[in-house]
Amino acid sequence: MVLYCRVSLNAFVESFRNTSGPDSFFTLPAKGLMHIVPQEEIEYGLSLLRESIGLYEERKRIPVEKSKKAMPFFRQDSRMLVGPEIGMYVIPLYEEPGEPAQSAEPSLVLELDYQSLGELCLFENYSLLSCKYEKEPILNHFTAQLEKEYDTFFFDEEHTGFTPDSRFFSMLCNACLEVKQPSSVGDKEWRLASLQATDEVLYRYEHGNLIPYVPISMPVDCLKRVYLEDFRRQPLLFGTLNGFLKSKGLPAEQLLNLS
């Protein structure tokens, strides 16, 4: 199995800045989830978690006055989740290459080996997540988790918090990272995700915004193919990319394909 990652030409060149041969690494930025995913998508995932809290309380006949369904999921005046000061950083991946990007800048599609990505996650404490689109299984999953987690978080008019052994913050993260609206099922999206403290990440200026990101280094053998989109518009680029990959000690003829 392979997964596809779309990158700009500039991002591709930057990712191989320190690459030197087939036994080395290339680096892609995992950007802050809140900065690259539409707000309504985040809110949809969290709304299903909130709905599952209500379903659990109905099942357990918890009085309305003791309900935790109205618990705030974000810090006040912030897009950061309540709980630890940890952010979610992702590289979007897809089961299919998708349509060419509508951009003035050339883009490439990287074909990445699923098994190699899985091994990377095991060794580096990343997560490779398959997005979920069906509402009922998501609600059932969250509600089942609440059997263990409901008593590990608290909420009243003055305080919101977690017990030391709580995994409710992980549920909040999963609602943001994994859940997508049913209408997006055709995306077949995966996410290579990293959770990092906000004071341990890097920042870059991009398209008028300040974007937090985490550099994720992958072994070169994780990369199976590089697809150049709409190459006929820029006939010089294919040969130049060929030379670029060779300059990094990589098998250009094996990696580079016309799309």
Model-predicted segments: where are they?
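NAD-dependent ADP-ribosyltransferases
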Residues: 1-259
